Amino acid sequence: MRSMLRWAALMGVGLLITGCAAQPLAPQVEEVVITQTPGSAETPAPQAGPITLYYPEGASQGDAAYALTYDLPVFSGTEPAVSAMNAAIEGWREELLDRVESERLPLADRAEGADLPGTQVTSLCVEAETPLGNFTSVLFYESDWYENENGATQRISTLVFDEAGLECNLAAASGVYDPLPLAAQQVWNIMSMDPSAYYGDLTIADVSESLDLYNGFSVAEEGYTLYVQPGILAADESNGRPLEFSFGRNALYPDFVGDLITVEEYEALLPQLFALASHCGPGFQSWQGEAFDPPEAFTHGFRLDSAALQGEALILRGQLIQGAPGELEATEVAVAQLTLTREQGGGWQLASLTLS
Protein backbone atom coordinates (compact mmCIF):
# COMPACT_ATOMS: atom_id res chain seq x y z
CA MET A 1 0.00 0.00 0.00
CA ARG A 2 1.34 3.40 -0.90
CA SER A 3 1.28 5.88 1.94
CA MET A 4 1.78 9.59 1.41
CA LEU A 5 4.08 12.08 3.04
CA ARG A 6 3.28 12.83 6.67
CA TRP A 7 3.92 16.55 6.86
CA ALA A 8 4.48 16.67 10.63
CA ALA A 9 8.11 15.78 9.95
CA LEU A 10 8.61 19.24 8.49
CA MET A 11 7.85 20.81 11.85
CA GLY A 12 10.56 18.83 13.58
CA VAL A 13 8.40 15.83 14.44
CA GLY A 14 9.67 12.54 13.06
CA LEU A 15 12.87 10.59 12.59
CA LEU A 16 15.91 11.76 10.68
CA ILE A 17 17.43 8.70 9.09
CA THR A 18 21.17 9.06 8.51
CA GLY A 19 22.80 6.21 6.71
CA CYS A 20 21.42 2.84 5.81
CA ALA A 21 22.95 0.42 8.27
CA ALA A 22 22.50 -3.21 7.40
CA GLN A 23 21.35 -6.19 9.39
CA PRO A 24 21.48 -9.81 8.23
CA LEU A 25 18.27 -11.09 6.71
CA ALA A 26 16.66 -14.07 8.35
CA PRO A 27 18.15 -17.31 6.98
CA GLN A 28 15.52 -18.69 4.64
CA VAL A 29 17.43 -19.40 1.46
CA GLU A 30 19.75 -22.02 0.11
CA GLU A 31 22.88 -19.93 -0.47
CA VAL A 32 23.89 -16.77 1.38
CA VAL A 33 27.14 -14.90 0.81
CA ILE A 34 27.86 -12.07 3.25
CA THR A 35 29.56 -8.99 1.77
CA GLN A 36 29.45 -5.80 3.81
CA THR A 37 29.67 -2.49 1.95
CA PRO A 38 30.02 0.95 3.61
CA GLY A 39 26.97 3.15 3.06
CA SER A 40 26.88 6.73 1.80
CA ALA A 41 24.37 9.12 0.28
CA GLU A 42 24.76 7.75 -3.24
CA THR A 43 26.37 4.31 -3.02
CA PRO A 44 24.98 0.79 -3.04
CA ALA A 45 22.93 0.34 0.09
CA PRO A 46 24.47 -1.89 2.78
CA GLN A 47 22.94 -5.31 2.56
CA ALA A 48 23.09 -8.69 4.16
CA GLY A 49 24.84 -10.05 1.10
CA PRO A 50 23.65 -11.66 -2.13
CA ILE A 51 21.00 -14.30 -1.56
CA THR A 52 20.39 -16.95 -4.22
CA LEU A 53 17.28 -19.08 -4.72
CA TYR A 54 17.06 -21.93 -7.24
CA TYR A 55 13.89 -22.97 -9.04
CA PRO A 56 11.91 -25.18 -8.93
CA GLU A 57 11.87 -25.45 -5.17
CA GLY A 58 14.43 -27.93 -3.90
CA ALA A 59 16.68 -27.66 -6.96
CA SER A 60 20.42 -27.06 -6.80
CA GLN A 61 22.58 -25.05 -9.16
CA GLY A 62 23.31 -28.10 -11.28
CA ASP A 63 19.72 -29.13 -11.97
CA ALA A 64 17.87 -25.82 -11.54
CA ALA A 65 15.77 -24.30 -14.30
CA TYR A 66 16.13 -20.76 -13.01
CA ALA A 67 18.00 -18.74 -10.38
CA LEU A 68 17.17 -15.58 -8.47
CA THR A 69 19.90 -13.58 -6.74
CA TYR A 70 19.11 -10.41 -4.84
CA ASP A 71 20.73 -7.83 -2.56
CA LEU A 72 18.23 -5.77 -0.59
CA PRO A 73 18.90 -3.17 2.12
CA VAL A 74 17.91 -3.74 5.73
CA PHE A 75 17.77 -0.61 7.89
CA SER A 76 18.94 -0.92 11.50
CA GLY A 77 17.13 0.48 14.52
CA THR A 78 13.93 0.00 16.47
CA GLU A 79 12.20 3.27 15.56
CA PRO A 80 8.78 3.04 13.88
CA ALA A 81 10.17 4.68 10.73
CA VAL A 82 12.84 2.01 10.40
CA SER A 83 10.29 -0.77 10.90
CA ALA A 84 8.01 0.79 8.29
CA MET A 85 10.79 0.99 5.70
CA ASN A 86 11.92 -2.57 6.32
CA ALA A 87 8.32 -3.77 6.03
CA ALA A 88 7.94 -1.99 2.68
CA ILE A 89 11.16 -3.54 1.39
CA GLU A 90 9.99 -6.97 2.55
CA GLY A 91 6.75 -6.36 0.66
CA TRP A 92 8.79 -5.55 -2.45
CA ARG A 93 10.77 -8.79 -1.96
CA GLU A 94 7.57 -10.83 -1.77
CA GLU A 95 6.34 -9.23 -5.00
CA LEU A 96 9.69 -10.10 -6.58
CA LEU A 97 9.31 -13.76 -5.63
CA ASP A 98 5.78 -13.84 -7.03
CA ARG A 99 6.96 -12.17 -10.25
CA VAL A 100 9.79 -14.65 -10.77
CA GLU A 101 7.55 -17.67 -10.14
CA SER A 102 4.62 -16.50 -12.27
CA GLU A 103 6.34 -14.60 -15.09
CA ARG A 104 10.00 -15.61 -15.41
CA LEU A 105 10.11 -19.28 -14.48
CA PRO A 106 7.52 -20.34 -17.10
CA LEU A 107 9.79 -18.87 -19.82
CA ALA A 108 12.89 -20.71 -18.66
CA ASP A 109 13.98 -23.62 -20.87
CA ARG A 110 17.50 -24.53 -19.84
CA ALA A 111 19.21 -26.86 -22.27
CA GLU A 112 21.72 -29.39 -20.99
CA GLY A 113 25.07 -27.68 -20.47
CA ALA A 114 23.65 -24.20 -21.02
CA ASP A 115 24.08 -21.28 -18.68
CA LEU A 116 21.47 -20.99 -15.99
CA PRO A 117 18.88 -18.30 -16.81
CA GLY A 118 17.96 -16.04 -13.96
CA THR A 119 17.15 -12.73 -12.37
CA GLN A 120 19.58 -10.58 -10.43
CA VAL A 121 18.56 -7.64 -8.22
CA THR A 122 20.89 -5.00 -6.83
CA SER A 123 19.91 -1.89 -4.90
CA LEU A 124 21.04 1.66 -4.31
CA CYS A 125 20.18 3.89 -1.34
CA VAL A 126 20.05 7.68 -1.79
CA GLU A 127 19.34 10.11 1.05
CA ALA A 128 18.35 13.71 0.42
CA GLU A 129 17.67 16.75 2.56
CA THR A 130 15.11 19.03 0.91
CA PRO A 131 13.03 22.08 1.93
CA LEU A 132 10.16 19.68 2.64
CA GLY A 133 12.12 17.30 4.82
CA ASN A 134 14.48 14.37 4.45
CA PHE A 135 13.82 11.52 2.06
CA THR A 136 15.34 8.10 1.52
CA SER A 137 15.12 6.60 -1.97
CA VAL A 138 15.77 2.91 -2.49
CA LEU A 139 16.39 1.92 -6.11
CA PHE A 140 16.00 -1.71 -7.20
CA TYR A 141 17.78 -2.73 -10.41
CA GLU A 142 16.29 -5.95 -11.70
CA SER A 143 18.01 -7.80 -14.57
CA ASP A 144 16.95 -11.07 -16.14
CA TRP A 145 18.38 -13.14 -18.96
CA TYR A 146 17.66 -16.29 -20.91
CA GLU A 147 19.86 -18.52 -23.05
CA ASN A 148 18.13 -17.52 -26.30
CA GLU A 149 18.40 -13.76 -25.71
CA ASN A 150 21.28 -11.37 -26.30
CA GLY A 151 22.18 -9.66 -23.07
CA ALA A 152 20.11 -8.99 -20.01
CA THR A 153 17.03 -6.81 -19.81
CA GLN A 154 17.04 -4.43 -16.87
CA ARG A 155 14.14 -2.80 -15.11
CA ILE A 156 14.13 -0.34 -12.26
CA SER A 157 11.64 0.33 -9.49
CA THR A 158 11.90 2.58 -6.47
CA LEU A 159 10.57 3.15 -3.00
CA VAL A 160 10.80 6.69 -1.61
CA PHE A 161 10.33 7.20 2.13
CA ASP A 162 9.77 10.33 4.20
CA GLU A 163 11.16 10.88 7.70
CA ALA A 164 8.32 8.86 9.21
CA GLY A 165 9.20 5.88 7.02
CA LEU A 166 6.06 6.26 4.91
CA GLU A 167 6.14 5.72 1.16
CA CYS A 168 5.84 8.88 -0.92
CA ASN A 169 4.89 9.62 -4.49
CA LEU A 170 6.40 12.56 -6.38
CA ALA A 171 3.56 14.87 -5.33
CA ALA A 172 4.25 14.21 -1.66
CA ALA A 173 8.01 14.55 -2.04
CA SER A 174 7.83 17.76 -4.07
CA GLY A 175 4.86 19.46 -2.41
CA VAL A 176 3.22 19.88 -5.83
CA TYR A 177 -0.39 18.76 -6.12
CA ASP A 178 -0.30 17.70 -9.79
CA PRO A 179 3.32 17.17 -10.83
CA LEU A 180 2.64 14.90 -13.82
CA PRO A 181 2.24 17.62 -16.51
CA LEU A 182 5.30 19.46 -15.22
CA ALA A 183 7.38 16.29 -14.97
CA ALA A 184 6.34 15.15 -18.45
CA GLN A 185 7.30 18.56 -19.85
CA GLN A 186 10.75 18.29 -18.27
CA VAL A 187 11.27 14.84 -19.80
CA TRP A 188 10.01 16.14 -23.14
CA ASN A 189 12.48 19.05 -22.98
CA ILE A 190 15.36 16.68 -22.26
CA MET A 191 14.33 14.40 -25.12
CA SER A 192 14.16 17.35 -27.53
CA MET A 193 17.89 17.93 -27.05
CA ASP A 194 18.61 14.59 -28.77
CA PRO A 195 15.46 13.65 -30.71
CA SER A 196 17.15 10.92 -32.77
CA ALA A 197 17.62 8.86 -29.60
CA TYR A 198 13.85 8.39 -29.25
CA TYR A 199 10.99 7.10 -31.35
CA GLY A 200 10.02 9.72 -33.89
CA ASP A 201 6.24 9.58 -33.46
CA LEU A 202 6.17 10.18 -29.70
CA THR A 203 3.95 12.87 -28.20
CA ILE A 204 4.06 14.46 -24.78
CA ALA A 205 1.00 12.36 -23.94
CA ASP A 206 3.10 9.24 -24.60
CA VAL A 207 5.75 10.62 -22.26
CA SER A 208 3.14 11.18 -19.54
CA GLU A 209 1.90 7.60 -19.88
CA SER A 210 5.45 6.26 -19.56
CA LEU A 211 6.10 7.92 -16.19
CA ASP A 212 5.51 6.22 -12.85
CA LEU A 213 5.38 8.91 -10.16
CA TYR A 214 4.89 6.33 -7.42
CA ASN A 215 7.62 3.75 -7.98
CA GLY A 216 9.62 5.25 -10.84
CA PHE A 217 11.41 8.24 -9.36
CA SER A 218 14.02 9.15 -6.78
CA VAL A 219 14.80 12.24 -4.73
CA ALA A 220 18.23 13.85 -4.51
CA GLU A 221 19.26 17.09 -2.85
CA GLU A 222 19.52 18.73 -6.26
CA GLY A 223 16.15 17.56 -7.54
CA TYR A 224 14.45 14.48 -8.95
CA THR A 225 15.20 11.65 -11.36
CA LEU A 226 12.45 9.89 -13.31
CA TYR A 227 12.97 6.40 -14.73
CA VAL A 228 11.37 4.95 -17.87
CA GLN A 229 11.58 1.23 -18.57
CA PRO A 230 13.42 0.08 -21.73
CA GLY A 231 11.56 -0.26 -25.01
CA ILE A 232 9.07 2.55 -24.39
CA LEU A 233 10.77 5.78 -25.49
CA ALA A 234 14.28 4.96 -26.70
CA ALA A 235 14.77 4.29 -30.42
CA ASP A 236 17.71 1.95 -29.73
CA GLU A 237 15.81 -1.27 -29.09
CA SER A 238 19.05 -3.15 -28.42
CA ASN A 239 19.60 -1.10 -25.27
CA GLY A 240 17.99 -3.04 -22.46
CA ARG A 241 18.60 -0.42 -19.78
CA PRO A 242 16.06 2.02 -18.31
CA LEU A 243 16.23 5.70 -19.21
CA GLU A 244 16.95 8.32 -16.56
CA PHE A 245 15.74 11.93 -16.70
CA SER A 246 16.99 14.31 -14.01
CA PHE A 247 15.96 17.90 -13.30
CA GLY A 248 16.08 20.40 -10.45
CA ARG A 249 13.42 20.99 -7.81
CA ASN A 250 12.64 24.41 -9.24
CA ALA A 251 11.37 22.79 -12.46
CA LEU A 252 8.16 21.93 -10.56
CA TYR A 253 7.73 25.35 -8.97
CA PRO A 254 5.24 27.99 -10.18
CA ASP A 255 6.34 30.12 -13.13
CA PHE A 256 6.83 33.23 -11.03
CA VAL A 257 9.56 31.56 -8.94
CA GLY A 258 12.88 32.81 -10.23
CA ASP A 259 11.27 36.00 -11.51
CA LEU A 260 9.40 37.76 -8.71
CA ILE A 261 10.81 35.61 -5.92
CA THR A 262 14.04 33.65 -5.89
CA VAL A 263 14.14 29.88 -5.62
CA GLU A 264 15.83 30.17 -2.23
CA GLU A 265 13.18 32.58 -0.93
CA TYR A 266 10.36 30.36 -2.18
CA GLU A 267 11.86 27.23 -0.64
CA ALA A 268 12.27 29.02 2.70
CA LEU A 269 8.53 29.81 2.63
CA LEU A 270 7.30 26.34 1.64
CA PRO A 271 6.94 24.83 5.16
CA GLN A 272 5.34 28.08 6.36
CA LEU A 273 2.82 27.97 3.52
CA PHE A 274 1.73 24.44 4.41
CA ALA A 275 1.55 25.36 8.10
CA LEU A 276 -0.59 28.43 7.38
CA ALA A 277 -2.90 26.50 5.05
CA SER A 278 -3.36 23.78 7.67
CA HIS A 279 -4.06 26.37 10.37
CA CYS A 280 -6.64 28.33 8.37
CA GLY A 281 -8.07 25.60 6.16
CA PRO A 282 -10.25 23.63 8.61
CA GLY A 283 -12.26 26.73 9.55
CA PHE A 284 -11.91 28.53 6.21
CA GLN A 285 -10.63 31.52 8.13
CA SER A 286 -8.52 34.36 6.81
CA TRP A 287 -5.36 35.45 8.61
CA GLN A 288 -3.85 38.85 9.33
CA GLY A 289 -0.44 37.99 10.72
CA GLU A 290 -1.36 36.83 14.23
CA ALA A 291 0.82 34.15 15.81
CA PHE A 292 -0.41 30.53 15.89
CA ASP A 293 0.89 27.18 17.01
CA PRO A 294 2.08 25.06 14.08
CA PRO A 295 -0.14 22.05 13.35
CA GLU A 296 1.05 18.57 14.21
CA ALA A 297 0.38 17.46 10.64
CA PHE A 298 -0.21 19.34 7.42
CA THR A 299 -3.78 18.79 6.26
CA HIS A 300 -4.08 21.62 3.71
CA GLY A 301 -1.89 23.40 1.21
CA PHE A 302 -1.91 25.99 -1.55
CA ARG A 303 -1.73 25.65 -5.30
CA LEU A 304 -0.26 28.98 -6.36
CA ASP A 305 -1.11 30.04 -9.90
CA SER A 306 0.08 33.65 -10.24
CA ALA A 307 1.98 36.44 -8.54
CA ALA A 308 2.21 40.20 -8.91
CA LEU A 309 4.03 43.05 -7.20
CA GLN A 310 1.84 45.72 -5.64
CA GLY A 311 4.10 48.43 -4.33
CA GLU A 312 6.36 46.81 -1.75
CA ALA A 313 4.15 43.72 -1.41
CA LEU A 314 4.08 40.49 -3.40
CA ILE A 315 0.58 39.11 -3.97
CA LEU A 316 0.21 35.36 -4.60
CA ARG A 317 -3.07 33.99 -5.92
CA GLY A 318 -4.28 30.43 -6.18
CA GLN A 319 -6.38 27.79 -4.45
CA LEU A 320 -6.59 26.44 -0.94
CA ILE A 321 -6.44 22.64 -1.18
CA GLN A 322 -7.89 20.30 1.42
CA GLY A 323 -5.48 17.40 1.73
CA ALA A 324 -1.70 17.23 1.43
CA PRO A 325 0.08 16.70 -1.89
CA GLY A 326 0.04 13.03 -2.78
CA GLU A 327 -3.37 12.34 -1.28
CA LEU A 328 -5.86 11.12 -3.88
CA GLU A 329 -8.75 13.02 -2.29
CA ALA A 330 -7.02 16.43 -2.26
CA THR A 331 -9.65 18.97 -3.34
CA GLU A 332 -9.83 22.69 -4.08
CA VAL A 333 -11.97 24.32 -1.40
CA ALA A 334 -11.40 28.09 -1.62
CA VAL A 335 -9.74 30.87 -3.58
CA ALA A 336 -6.63 32.05 -1.74
CA GLN A 337 -4.76 35.35 -1.85
CA LEU A 338 -1.52 35.65 0.09
CA THR A 339 0.29 38.90 0.79
CA LEU A 340 4.06 38.82 1.33
CA THR A 341 6.15 41.71 2.60
CA ARG A 342 9.89 42.23 2.76
CA GLU A 343 11.80 41.29 5.88
CA GLN A 344 14.55 43.53 7.16
CA GLY A 345 17.09 41.00 5.94
CA GLY A 346 15.72 41.21 2.42
CA GLY A 347 13.66 38.02 2.17
CA TRP A 348 9.89 37.66 1.98
CA GLN A 349 7.59 36.96 4.92
CA LEU A 350 3.92 36.02 5.10
CA ALA A 351 1.76 39.00 6.04
CA SER A 352 -1.86 37.97 5.40
CA LEU A 353 -4.17 35.39 3.83
CA THR A 354 -7.61 36.03 2.40
CA LEU A 355 -9.90 33.10 1.59
CA SER A 356 -13.04 33.44 -0.51
Residue ranges and their predicted role:
Residues 1-9:
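Bacterial N-terminal signal peptides that target proteins for export
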Residues 6, 43, 265, 269-273, ...:
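Intrinsically disordered, low-complexity serine/threonine-rich segments
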Residues 16-19:
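C-terminal motif of bacterial Sec signal peptides marking the signal peptidase cleavage site
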Residues 21-250, 258, 282, 287-312, ...:
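Compositionally biased intrinsically disordered regions enriched in Thr/Gly
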Residues 177, 254-283:
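Glycine-centered tight-turn and secondary-structure capping sites
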